Design a protein with these regions (language model features):
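Short amphipathic, positively biased membrane-proximal segments
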Residues: 1-175
Length: 175
């Protein structure tokens, strides 16, 4: 019998699906959570990459401010639906960014991760839009109030995703 060691491959697929789902719900939340993680747990896979900016603490702070601003702006009556093409494109790009950065950090293909993240973000956009509008119509609850619940789900989901990631080293400070 052979004595072989099984090589443990770092998780790539499911974390991207998680981050991209966040991007479909709130476009800036996924990059904010991922950059927060990378700023505390830098990965050699991003060294020398155009995506290395995601590891900078200033990037993490700026993305958190933008994510908070998006959550406020989402409740305004003039905010367009997430499924119109320009807004949908932003969510696709956000999902592609987190997918590419995560795959690259795990020494994978940034292109493959970007495609996966972008497609998952688009799917999550349509699902979350249908859920939000459906809940609002079925319960006669204002869409903005349902949006507050969606914000809570995004924050809780992002925090759970970060806690679930296998940590490479050092002390972890979730938020």
């Amino acid at each position: 019998m052979k004595n072989s060691k099984k090589k443990i491959r770092p998780a790539k697929f499911w974390p991207v699906i998680g981050f991209a789902t966040l991007a479909g719900m709130r476009s800036m939340s996924a990059p904010a959570f991922l950059s927060h993680y990378f700023s505390r747990q830098p990965h050699a896979g991003l060294d020398g990459s155009m995506l290395r900016f995601m590891q900078k603490p200033l990037t993490a702070k700026a993305l958190k401010v933008m994510a908070a601003g998006e959550m406020v702006a989402d409740k305004l009556p003039t905010t367009p639906d997430r499924i119109i093409p320009p807004v949908l494109l932003g969510r696709l790009l956000s999902g592609a960014l987190v997918g590419a950065a995560w795959y690259k950090s795990r020494h994978g293909s940034a292109l493959g991760g970007g495609v996966l993240g972008g497609l998952a973000a688009v799917a999550a956009t349509f699902v979350s839009y249908a859920l939000r509008t459906g809940i609002s119509m079925q319960t006669a609850t204002p869409v903005a109030l349902v949006g507050v619940g969606e914000d809570a789900l995004v924050v809780a989901g992002g925090a759970a995703l970060l806690r679930g990631l296998q940590l490479a080293q050092g002390e972890w400070r979730p938020m």
